[in-house]
Amino acid sequence: MADADSANPQFLEWVKEWLDLARERNSKGVTTYRTAYNSLKACPISFEHPAQLQQLKGFGPKLCERLEQQLKKHCEQNGLPMPPHPRSRKAAPVTSDENGEGSSKPAKKARKQKAYVPALRSGAFALVVGLSTLDEDTATGMTKAELIEVAQPYCDASFSAPSDPTKFYTAWNSMKTLLQKELVYERGRPLRRYALTDEGWEVAKRIKDTDHWQAEKDRTKDPTSAQPVIPNFQPGAISRQKSPSVEIAEPAQALSEYQNVVADGLTTSDDASLPNFTPILLPPGTFTVQLVLDVREVRAKTDRDYMQEELAKQGAKPIMRSMELGDAQWVAKCNDPNLLSSQGAEGDEVVLDWIVERKRLDDLIGSIKDGRFHEQKFRLQRSGVKKVIYIIEEIGMDPEVINRYAEAVRSAIASTQVVNGYFVKRTNKMDDTIRYLTRMTAMLKRTYESRSLHVIPTKVLTSQNYLPLLKHLRESISPDWYITYPAFSSLASKSESITLRDVFLKMLMTIKGVTGEKALEIQKCWKTPYDFVKAFEACGPGEQGLKRKRELVFSQTSHLVGRKKFTKPLSTKIAEVWGNT
């Protein structure tokens, strides 16, 4: 239907103008205006005043007020009377009978719809408050991890672990409600970002106008009165009254402190372009091996410190911080905090070749369903860490759910072991996981504290040369090379930024049968999607061209053996996707 044929062409024209303007500016209001435009265009009812539009989807008080101002301006310019506001119209007088008494009861006053304000310290409340810490004009938004970190102190429930181990739901599920009410919009794939819509900002302002807001601000500032699920650790050692053996050895580091430690650099073409350097040597006795645990590793909202307290009781006191990758790992912590800095490095920790990804069975099923499982393994591969351990915790779940996803879980575990070469450890409960981490810590102490560590200086590292350099050193000199924790975190944070190379690999891996190894071999022959498409176009038309397309990948990779080898049927399948065969 054309805009001119709409029941409200003038209102529709103005909303369309604002929608086009929002698109030009790449504004966050695009979603709101598009929803309002579509609902108004589809509505067959004619409205006199913009206030009446609030009954349509996408029209909030702010948009209706803007339309009202536009209508006033339009009426003044064209000498037209301004339609009366629906609320200002007087009710018709009640007719009386001969005795002067009303023949009917007065009409009931319409009940005004209450403006939405989420419940205090609920998931929706915390998410709105967290997003309102952004500047109202910003278009960047927050990632899920960034938003959870900001929102958690304002919520009683956990954003990472269900309050009941038998349930799937966390406080993050409130995001669905906010998206449905169009208070929040999301954008970006695969890394989604969230921001408040205009209506969302109105809700945030209403929250901050309530009597409870000042008390809530004071509560989150005072760590003794607030009980967030993820503690907001302050710099320095903090001892807990509940368990004197537990102390936070180091504060959580912000992403911005590590993000630019390692430069991006240029692409490394061959071994000759790799840097030469003198390694930093850490002799035995100059460091101790310590476990690092992610602060988000909690059992439930009532036992947020259970894991670190139990580890401390068993002699494996963890360093608590927000980790860029994995849920636990081990570092060599220098006895002299200035040892590394005196040799041109940063920090006082060196990352060892062990990292742990812990997953409860319900989280594993969820990550398989939404693709996070493969995304996490992809990032772990790019970390350069040789020994990756997947701990899978069994929990009480609905047998129907377990049976439904049993095959997917078995396939994921087998793939992790066989294709990725990672070790999978299955435990029955968190206590078993804690005992396993304790034993691993003791074993790694015995293994590493009696040997020297060769550390690659951060100044020679770039995000482009890190993996080729590590591979070259391990193959030609020694299998054991290490980097500092700040450098590792910087590289891990950069791995979230998807490059064209990463996108190409992921595109290839969507084809059934193309593993990560096979995708890498294709990329060695054709660096970009453009090169790959051009190679198929060069095969020419007709039957002969079709045959060449189907055999293109097979013929170019015929030297490969084992898991990297391409079969003719797989080559044909790739041609069907990329070569329009």
Swiss-Prot record:
DNA damage listed as a keyword: yes
SMART domains, per the entry: ERCC4 (SM00891)
CDD domains according to UniProt: WH_MUS81 (cd21036), XPF_nuclease_Mus81 (cd20074)
Keywords carried by this UniProt record: DNA damage, DNA recombination, DNA repair, Endonuclease, Hydrolase, Magnesium, Meiosis, Metal-binding, Nuclease, Nucleus
SUPFAM superfamilies, alphabetized: DNA polymerase beta, N-terminal domain-like, Restriction endonuclease-like
UniProt cofactor(s): Mg(2+)
Subunit structure: Interacts with EME1.
Function: Interacts with EME1 to form a DNA structure-specific endonuclease with substrate preference for branched DNA structures with a 5'-end at the branch nick. Typical substrates include 3'-flap structures, D-loops, replication forks and nicked Holliday junctions. May be required in mitosis for the processing of stalled or collapsed replication fork intermediates. May be required in meiosis for the repair of meiosis-specific double strand breaks subsequent to single-end invasion (SEI).
Protein name from the UniProt record: Crossover junction endonuclease MUS81
Lineage of source species: Eukaryota, Fungi, Dikarya, Ascomycota, Pezizomycotina
Chain's gene name: MUS81
